[in-house]
Amino acid sequence: SEGAAIMVGTRTALLDNPSLNVRHWSGNSPVRVVLDRRLVIPDSYRLLNGFSRTLIFTEKEVENRENVEYIRIDFEGPVIRQVLDHLAARKLDSLLVEGGAQLINSFVEADVWDEARVETAPVRLYQGVHAPMLGKEAVSGISRRSVMSIKNHNYEIFNTKKHIKTWI
């Protein structure tokens, strides 16, 4: 894996039932990070199978189990900052925010991202959460690093000029 941790929100976890592990690639699987405020993800889902280390951020007090750690945070406060504080305390120095759109928007709005890998396809979606929109200030500091197209899909990598520092 290229990153220390990979994160999804509740809705993406419920809709996709992702594994968030390494497949067809060498190296260790990243730590799985899930934002599940009310603990609505069923125990039968892959994220809770205990095969890989998993951190669940929630508002509930829950006992940990094998390879699944429940971390209680205040959802009335700055959620993203709290998540990053806990990840930094665990020496997890890189985080891939897989999605969904609401979670990605939260990171963009908190201005705590330094690279975006964007995949687009010739498909128009008319429902769901809109993709992140960047304001004029954010756009002025962004550079496009590379573009690649494969079978009607475009892959782009964007970088900001800033460096994200841990909150601690």
Labelled PLM ranges:
Residues S1-I168:
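Enzymes that bind and transform nitrogen-containing heteroaromatic metabolites
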